[in-house]
Curated annotation (Swiss-Prot):
It is found in: Cell membrane. It comes from Streptococcus equi subsp. zooepidemicus (strain MGCS10565). It is a single-pass membrane protein. GO terms for cellular component: plasma membrane. This is UPF0154 protein Sez_1648. InterPro entries: UPF0154. Keywords: Cell membrane, Membrane, Transmembrane, Transmembrane helix. Belongs to the UPF0154 family. It comes from the Bacteria. The chain crosses the membrane at residues 4-24. It holds the Pfam family UPF0154. Signal peptide: none annotated.
Length: 80
């Protein structure tokens, strides 16, 4: 094979590897964020207390569930 064909094959392989790696990393990050949201009930409790509210545990859990629900809805909307 000529040198030009080898160079072309190397460029194609590197490009395919780059795009494959980006795709796999993106899917793993989406899965991780979906399973373990960055905002925890403790963080919600702290934010509410900083805003001067005295939140009940039911209010914190309701807010947390709404955030998780919105996160999952955004993930499924993005997959379409």
């Amino acid at each position: 094979m000529s040198t030009a064909i080898w160079i072309l094959l190397i460029i194609v392989a590197l490009t395919a590897g780059l795009f494959g790696g980006i795709f796999i990393a993106r899917k793993q990050i989406e899965k991780e964020i979906g399973e373990h949201p960055r905002l925890t009930p403790e963080a919600i409790r702290e934010m509410m207390s900083q805003m001067g509210q005295k939140p009940s545990e039911a209010k914190i859990q309701q807010t947390y569930r709404n955030i998780v629900k919105q996160s999952k809805a955004a993930m499924t909307k993005g997959k379409k």
